[in-house]
Amino acid sequence: MIRKKLLLLFALLPACALCAQKQQDLTAYVNTMQGSHNTPEFSHGRCTPLVTLPQGVNSWSPVGFSYVGRSAAGVGGCGIVLRPLTEAPSPETATATVDTASIIGRPHYFRMRTSDGILSEMSPTERCAVFRFTYPRRSEALLALSGEEMDGVEADAAARCVTGYVIRRSNVSQAADKTWFLLRFDRDFTVDEDRKGGTLLLRFGRGGTVGVQAAVSKIDARQARVTFGRELEGKRFGEVCEAARERWNGMLGRIEVEGGTPEQRRTFYSCLFRTMLRPAQDYETDAEGRERFAYDGEVYEGRYHVNPILWDAYRSLFALHNIINRAEEERYVQSLMRTQELTGWWPSGHVMIGNHAISVLADAWAKGIRTFDPEEALGRYYREITRSAVDTLNNGDYNREHVRGYGRLGFEDYFAMGYIPYPQGTDRVMETTSKTIEYNYDDFCAWRLARMTGNDFYERIFARHIYNYRNVFDPADGFFKGRDREGRFDEDFNPYEWGGPFVEGNGWQWRFSVQQDARGMIGLMGGEE
């Protein structure tokens, strides 16, 4: 296990500090509600409170009490929702107010009390979860089950089980995701036959506690049963919760913080928790011990990862994993190669810019990871950046919008001119200056990978591009700007304006985005003074 110590710089922990670290419950510092206060403004409160395991296959959220699977900002979850109620749902009783003072949000445990008096708790395993709903003594104990396109539902009151599946139609894929579920309860129930609105209502009598064990599978119903048997059979809520707490303490304990206030420690470990959610594992182990995963309606053998969100993470998250979670990073770079093999594209966040898988691979190689073929990676990267997914689709604007992050929009101009002109005559290529800068960074990473591995062919190809960022730098005022086909910089440039030739930023923010050539940027800006 790798452990690091954070003061102002990383250093190795002494043995006595390690012993002290083992005795701490670091999950107590984590607040999964941090960053979840959503407001209408863009990028405010986009963190979902989740219970899951480190890079866990599944995540669960108190939105209702739901399985959200691959949820991310701008990407919906898989939509299996449990709602504890004290009366049958109606437009008037659809929601209950949460007592915010009652909320405990930890990586391994979530608890809250609602205005109807129900205390709700949940805790995760790798692919499953357990729930405990405690109802007021004199109230009805009801549980509503709903989901996106929920179908195939069978309620077996004798076995205290409900099975079925939901279908999620993603905004990032043309294929529909089918997720099978198996729910087992620790109390007898009756089923309300009125299933209007796609909701199944279970009645457990008066008050008391209702325990629920939930397993899901993206492969089939049989796999859900296998997973249930492996992860939940015979286990109580407290046992699952404690095992999850130990897993999280093991991961959070890889970095120890010294000094600072309790509030600063809570902030640090709450953020560290977020770094350990992705990339998420997305494979299941069948009854014969084979690791399998479902993709695009087919089932394949091996391990697979989802939710890398490379544009947001390539320069920070994966570099951190290389230090504190190396074994998983070794497996992830293999998964990157597998993803490209299956889909024809590197994962790139579907609407974001750049081809940052090559950055992750180059960084991994530089730090000694050897679980992929660098020549194969460079060849696939070259094919990736000399085409665009938009050019391969003729299915309307919806699909065009949601594949524009795959491949390299504007690659023709980028290779011919060394930058992508702005403004364009059409809306085909947006955010042209940001694209130029990030394409340049990725080509630099490819050049470095080729150089580290002695690949003269690709080293010569990418050496032509490693200073392209300079082509959109205006020495007159020291900013990157939009530049038209005649070489003229944008006369209406405003360094504070969001958008235009930039993506998710303005001229000031993109001014400091050449992380691969700090010395060159110092020179462009007139020197160190």
Language model: regions and residue ranges:
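Residues within alpha-helical transmembrane segments of multi-pass membrane proteins, especially transporters
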Residues: 13-17, 219, 364
